[in-house]
Amino acid sequence: MSEADGLRQRRPLRPQVVTDDDGQAPEAKDGSSFSGRVFRVTFLMLAVSLTVPLLGAMMLLESPIDPQPLSFKEPPLLLGVLHPNTKLRQAERLFENQLVGPESIAHIGDVMFTGTADGRVVKLENGEIETIARFGSGPCKTRDDEPVCGRPLGIRAGPNGTLFVADAYKGLFEVNPWKREVKLLLSSETPIEGKNMSFVNDLTVTQDGRKIYFTDSSSKWQRRDYLLLVMEGTDDGRLLEYDTVTREVKVLLDQLRFPNGVQLSPAEDFVLVAETTMARIRRVYVSGLMKGGADLFVENMPGFPDNIRPSSSGGYWVGMSTIRPNPGFSMLDFLSERPWIKRMIFKLFSQETVMKFVPRYSLVLELSDSGAFRRSLHDPDGLVATYISEVHEHDGHLYLGSFRSPFLCRLSLQAV
């Protein structure tokens, strides 16, 4: 055989595949499977350790609220006069970090007055803050101190150079800001038709100063628990009338869900009352042929109304600290028909924690004298104006009160 024939008969060596049951590859596979099982078991144990206490808490803890299912219409579309804008961002902040919670505002001449979260009624003049009244006693550092400290909310200028003030915990007062004199008109400890007043809120006064119309937002919840009142949907609020001469008190309308801001009409024939939980404003007739009657002034509002104040155009300003976005998702509308979720939320979280999830969308509405939407001013992210409670018009400006911000805002009407 030649050398060439030998080369033709040789075949290339093929690599051998060795399969050895005792080899290293299977050991690595078994190790990986073991690690995976350890991870899964650890994850499962961690999940169980977290879930069981959570479920136990949900089962054993009592919810502070007993919410009732509520039904809302689809919110109005934010179009036309409701179209979002940033006009509120043109406002300037006043007395920033010098006061907290200037809920309501009144002027006597060019001197401004408001109430603060630490229980004071203060005068704001020439950039200075001066305390003129206090209805409770200190210390007044936290929300839990409010029942002792008092919390001035609605404030109005009377016809004789005095102020009428509604304190959430103490009742109705008349204050002479020049002499620092305080007169208790109606104590919140006075039962009205068998019910306590737990949350005196806003007030409006006739031009002669004789009658005061005011809201008691709840006979169950206090102001410091306002979020529980909203979420529970309690219908124990009332609109009342106080006669400063006879000292008589009448219930004008009851079974209201968080009655809040109030405003007399220019003719003093009806009173508007914001029913915050229901996103609407009711009208109650207090004189004339329709006296004693009531109807809806505005329903299905784009937000939850707080105080109502007159506008120079003959209509009304309404402050709102949050809205019902459409298009968009309204958490409060969603929760309204799901009381079981509300119970669960407040079993696990405090009011302050829940408030952090409430959108900081500030909205101001101007209504016509018939309740039509005339214009709207927005701050979609609450960058300048936050937690708006009231819109007070004075001398070509809007003063924006707030129930929790450490400032108030001033906005020129010429800018909007």
UniProtKB/Swiss-Prot annotation:
Give positions of region: Disordered.
1-32
**Coarse class of the protein's main subcellular location:** membrane
Q: Report the InterPro entries cross-referenced here.
A: 6-blade_b-propeller_TolB-like, Strictosidine_synth_cons-reg
The reply to whether Protein biosynthesis figures as a keyword in the UniProt entry is no
Q: Where are the N-acetylserine modifications?
A: 2
| Residues found modified as Phosphothreonine | 19
Read off the Pfam families from this record: SSL_N (PF20067), Str_synth (PF03088)
Q: Write the signal peptide boundaries.
A: none
Q: What is this protein called?
A: Adipocyte plasma membrane-associated protein
Q: Which gene encodes it?
A: APMAP
